[in-house]
Each structure stands twice: as C-alpha cells, then as structure tokens.
C-alpha cells in the first residue's frame, strides 16, 4: 500500500546532505506543513523530515476502514497510569499531512476564555498569548482550507464563515431535534474543513463517509493537499520515511542540525541554522528527551523539568442511540453539527470548565468495536447489532481535561526498530475531570433521548492529545515562549499541539495550524537574527503576511449573499 517519495513523481528541490539549510522541520503534519509552505515562500531553504510516507492520494488511500490502518502512528508505545490512554489510530497520524490526513475536520476555534483559564477560573494555566493574537490566523486558515460553516457561529468570539454549510445528515437531524427539544442552541452544517462547493481543482464533498480514511476525492482539507504542494513549488524539500533520532547541540549552545535514520536504517545528519520540532504531543517530547546531552542531562531544552509534563487528552466518549427510522450515519460528513453551549465554566456545576457535543459518524467496523465496548456484544449478538447499523446515531462529547503535572511522557526501557527508547505515557484523571465527564455523559445521553432514540449506550474514550511542551512566559514552568522558541536554546523551536497550556473543548486542528502560521510570521519578521543572535525580541509583533497563494483558495464557491 505504502510507497516512498522516490516512487511518486513530485518534482522538488533536493539539498545535498552536506548543505546547511536554514530550517529543518521535524514532522510534516498539521503544523509542519504550514511552516514548510510559509518559510519556503519567504525564500528560506527548508527541509521537512517525516517519519511516515509521502502519500499518493490515488494509490494509497482507500474507501476501506481496514485498509487505512497505516495512516496512523501505530509503532510501539507504552501506556500506563490509573486511566491509561489508548495510543494509536485515534490520536496520531504518520505520513506527510500527519493527523490532518485522518482528522474528521471539525474546525471550531478556541474561545477567548481558553487563553486565560487560570485568571478566570483559578484552574489550569494562562496562555502567554490572547485570542486577539491568534484571531487573524484563524481567519486566514479558515479561508485557506477552506472551512464551511454557518453564517453566524454564536459561541466564544461570534463569527461567520465565508463558505456555506453542508446539508444535514441523519445524525445531524438527531442532534438538532434533541437540542431543540431541550432548548439548547446548536450549530448546523459545520464548521468543518470539507468543501461544500468546488474549490480550485478540488471537488465538492460527495458524502461517501470515509473522511478519516484520508478522503480519496480531496474534498477534505489536509496540509498534504492545502499547503505541501505550494511548499514544494516554492523550493522546499520533504524527505519521507526518515525517523529523526536526535537534535544535535553545538559547543556554542545552539543546535546545529538533526540526526535521522532513512528507510534502510542508514544514519544521516542534516545541518541546519535552526530546527523546528513539529512531531506532536508524544514524539516531540520523546525526541527532546532522547536528545539529552551534557548540560541537558534530563532532556534537551528541559531546564524547567517540564518537557513531557502536562500532557492532555480530551474526554471523547461516544454516545450512541438507536432510532426506529433509518439514520444512515455514514451520510454527510461525520462532523456537521455541534453545540458548545456547555463549553464555559458554570458556577452552578461542581467542576470547572466544560464540554461540547458533536456529531460523529463511525463506519461499520468502528461501530462494531463500539458495540463490543458499550454492550459487550459478541458472536450472534454482535451480528444482530451490526445488521441494525443504519438505525444508529452517534454523538461525541469533547470534555476539557485540565493540565496536570503527573500526566506525562517519559522514556521507556523498550526500544523501537531503530534502537531508540519508545515513549511511556502515564495518564490519570483527577476529581475535576471525573465530575466533568460524568455531567457531559449525562447531558449527551439526554440530548440523544430527546432526539428520539429508543435505546442509548456509550463508550468511554479519549481524543486529541496536546500539551507536554507547554508555552509560557516563565522559563521555570514552561518549555517555549509565546512564539514557540525554547527558553533554553535560541535557535530551537517547537510548533505543534504539544505547546498548548490548556486545551478547551474544541478540536485542536485549526488552532495548531493557526499557531504555525503565527510562528512562521515571527520567524520571517526576525529574518537572519534567528540564525545568528541569542537575543530574543519578545516585543515586536510578527508582521502578518498573506503568504497563502490566492489561487489555492480564491476559486471556491463562496456563501451566497
């Protein structure tokens, strides 16, 4: 199924191994793809190193749940703690495009409150940036992907979307009916980064249901189709099937490049004036810990002891309801209706922060697994449930689990195929988390019943790993500053979901890409100072650049006035 870049006819610049590039980006996913494009368009020499393959969307992506297994990071990891996370297909992507290849493409923004959780609610942490700092990049990325959604989105910072919403499927109808019966506001038709009209050479969504299998038709946005092609056109290089093993620190206290293994297990060293880590919430801290060296014996850029700590996952329970009439939840994008009415802290609750309720659309194999988990169905019992698939609807709750110091990534004694220590992930729910999840499950089940379900069951699960290299103003309690530069090393940056201090109850994909665009603007604004100076310009705002080529987003079908 998988083919390396060498078998894909994609012209690109090739840097010689001895050449020193301006930026080496580790991981070409949601953040890495945006960074690669921005920096290449600004004229920098940039190489992206990706552990997975460079996907050929026609050859490698299939309308089949089992056949999409290799889209995910399924290499060994160790999981533990009192509430261990299931690591693998639900959390991490592998290959160019990263998690944006298999995301469902829900793209809500974080709320203004998410950036000052500690100040407002006395829990979690504040971000070193505000909603206003990232708002222009939300708007920019919503056009670039583009995002389809309602004309008015009422929660957080109210706003609308330039591209009209998708039609409702059966699951959306059930959510609307349930919310309406309980007087709960609901958003219809998005926001979702799936085309509701033709867009350049990308077609309208055909509502086939295989969104998290890569989207063979190209209607769903991923950086593989939205940003990487332009990056290559502007001189970037991507080396796929290259596993970065260590970031090298020079005697002058600055990084000099990265060591990596190719597909044959041969070792290489890519020299770089600056390095950006975009490997996400497990692989980025794992790489920093594996890069321990004299002066940083407990992990590179880890003078605070914070690398790997404050890992977060959202509560992602799936509530399923059976309806007398067919629902056919595979029709329409899985992500097409939601409510964030319970997102913010309510003083009447016995917990801080909140949750969202969204439509989801598990395909038959995933549905079967959920029936096993929720109803202990097996054998003929499972067969009966599977035969009833068209009558079931599924809602997913997204609950904000707070950042806790003991939820962390460390190194295991186990080794991967390259001999590198694999990640050990320890996760624990605290009392606030448990109370929030209990309330969220009860509310989601109530909405399902109000929507007309005659039977309701639920599966406990988690979604969306973030944190473990948090950003902050204090070098004693965080890993990077507000622009993603590590506090300890002036030419080493982290830009991915691992920098989140808190996570809200919104899917993180849009925020990850918006942060990448903001970091890129900062790097471009600073220019060669990034490569030569240890001084940090924290006062100058990044100059916002409309670097996305108009031809990539200007030909869509805008909302009718």
Segments from the language model and where they lie:
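Redox-cofactor-proximal catalytic regions of oxidoreductases
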Residues: 67-155, 345, 405
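FAD cofactor-binding and catalytic pocket of flavoenzymes
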Residues: 84-90, 127-131, 304-423, 477, ...
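Conserved redox-cofactor binding core of oxidoreductases
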Residues: 83, 118-244, 465, 470
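N-terminal Rossmann-like FAD-binding beta1-loop-alpha1 element of flavoenzymes
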Residues: 23-48
């Amino acid at each position: 199924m998988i083919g390396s870049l060498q078998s894909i006819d994609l012209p690109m610049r090739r840097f010689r191994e001895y050449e020193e590039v301006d930026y080496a980006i580790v991981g070409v996913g949601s953040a890495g793809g945006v960074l690669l494009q921005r920096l290449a368009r600004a004229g920098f020499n940039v190489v992206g190193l990706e552990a997975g393959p460079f996907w050929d969307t026609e050859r490698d992506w299939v309308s089949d749940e089992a056949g999409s297994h290799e889209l995910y990071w399924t290499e060994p990891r160790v999981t533990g703690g009192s509430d261990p996370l299931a690591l693998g297909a639900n959390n991490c992507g592998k290959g160019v495009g990263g998690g944006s290849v298999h995301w469902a493409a829900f793209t809500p923004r974080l709320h203004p409150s998410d950036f000052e959780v500690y100040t407002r609610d006395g829990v979690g942490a504040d971000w070193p940036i505000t909603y206003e700092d990232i708002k222009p990049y939300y708007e920019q990325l919503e056009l670039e992907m583009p995002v389809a959604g309602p004309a008015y989105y009422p929660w957080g910072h109210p706003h609308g979307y330039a591209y009209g919403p998708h039609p409702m499927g059966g699951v959306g109808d059930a959510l609307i009916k349930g919310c309406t019966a309980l007087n709960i506001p609901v958003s219809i038709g998005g926001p979702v980064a799936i085309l509701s009209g033709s867009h350049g050479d990308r077609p309208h969504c055909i509502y086939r249901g295989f969104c998290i299998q890569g989207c063979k038709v190209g209607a769903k946005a991923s950086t593989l189709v939205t940003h990487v092609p332009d990056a290559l056109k502007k001189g970037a290089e991507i080396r796929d099937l290259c596993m970065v093993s260590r970031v090298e620190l020079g005697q002058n206290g600055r990084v000099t490049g990265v060591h990596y293994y190719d597909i044959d297990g041969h070792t290489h060293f890519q020299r770089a004036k600056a390095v950006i880590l975009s490997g996400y919430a497990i692989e980025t801290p794992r790489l920093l810990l594996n890069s321990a060296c004299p002066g940083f014996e407990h992990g590179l850029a880890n003078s605070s002891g914070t690398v790997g700590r404050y890992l977060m996952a959202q509560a992602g329970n799936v509530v399923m309801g059976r309806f007398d009439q067919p629902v056919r939840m595979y029709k329409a994008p899985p992500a097409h209706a939601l409510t964030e009415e319970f997102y913010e802290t309510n003083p009447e609750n016995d917990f801080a922060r909140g949750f969202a309720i969204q439509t989801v659309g598990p395909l038959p194999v995933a549905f079967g697994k959920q029936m096993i988990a929720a109803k202990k169905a097996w054998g003929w019992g499972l067969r009966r449930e599977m035969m009833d698939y068209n009558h079931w609807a599924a809602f997913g709750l997204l609950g904000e689990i707070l950042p806790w110091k003991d939820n962390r990534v460390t190194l295991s004694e186990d080794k991967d195929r390259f001999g590198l220590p694999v990640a050990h992930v320890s996760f624990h729910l605290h009392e606030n988390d448990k109370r929030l999840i209990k309330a969220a499950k009860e509310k989601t089940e109530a909405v399902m019943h109000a929507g007309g379900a005659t039977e309701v069951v639920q599966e406990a699960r988690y979604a969306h790993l973030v944190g473990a290299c948090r950003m902050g103003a204090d070098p004693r309690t965080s890993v990077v500053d507000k622009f993603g530069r590590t506090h300890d090393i002036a030419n080493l940056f982290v830009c991915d979901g691992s920098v989140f201090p808190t996570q809200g109850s919104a899917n993180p994909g849009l925020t990850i890409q918006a942060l990448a665009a903001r970091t890129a603007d900062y790097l471009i604004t600073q220019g060669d100072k990034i490569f030569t100076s240890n001084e940090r310009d924290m006062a100058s705002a990044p100059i916002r650049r409309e670097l996305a080529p108009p031809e990539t987003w200007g030909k869509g079908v805008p909302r009718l006035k």
